[in-house]
A protein has these predicted regions:
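Short, small-residue-biased leader/transition segments that mark boundaries at the very start
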Residues: 1-5
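Proteins enriched for Cys/Gly/acidic motifs involved in redox and nucleic-acid/cofactor modification
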Residues: 7-170
Length: 170
């Protein structure tokens, strides 16, 4: 996955918060991003007020989902504005469809990751750590499989298996 994935020493002890919105495919993408971040030194926290970095994985299938995504981003952006967290990454459908508007309207956003670029989460983190904003909308370069790190967020007795990429609700 490249050199940027191996530079974890200076990330040890940093906390990561996350919000996953939308379908089961989005949840699997979130779990894999969490796995990549954990493998690179981040500790996962459910308390956003403790997080150094927050990832919001969004959905825009229906207008209500789009509104929920925007409201969630605005709530999370407040942590950055208050100086609680140092980085805000928005991933998923909303960032894919509205990248220009999001960067313009919500300056607290540090990185946007499209629906096909979840595997590039560490590239976005590296940019943030160097004081840069990034917008990664590439097609997926690594297809998810069981060897990729994944932090399961569902109860231990159930997990989603992702068999396709992208949104099949639209």
């Amino acid at each position: 996955l490249g050199d940027v994935y191996k530079r974890q020493g200076y990330r040890m002890g940093k906390k990561l918060g996350y919000v996953s919105l939308g379908c089961a495919k989005n949840l699997v993408d979130t779990e894999v991003m969490l796995g990549l971040l954990k493998d690179n030194g981040y500790t996962i926290t459910e308390n956003l007020s403790e997080a150094d970095l927050i990832v919001v994985n969004t959905c825009t299938f229906i207008e209500k989902a789009k509104a929920e995504s925007i409201n969630t981003i605005l709530e999370v952006a407040q942590y950055k504005e208050d100086g609680v967290c140092k980085g805000l990454i928005v991933a998923g459908c909303l960032s894919q469809q509205y990248q220009d508007e999001l960067f313009k309207e919500i300056p607290e956003i540090d990185a946007l990751i499209g629906t096909g670029a979840w595997d590039q989460i560490m590239v976005a983190v590296d940019a943030i750590e160097h004081g840069n904003r990034s917008c990664i909308m590439e097609n997926i370069t690594n297809i998810y499989d069981e060897r990729m790190p994944r932090i399961q967020t569902t109860p231990r007795y159930s997990a989603y298996v992702k068999i396709a990429e992208g949104c099949n609700n639209g």
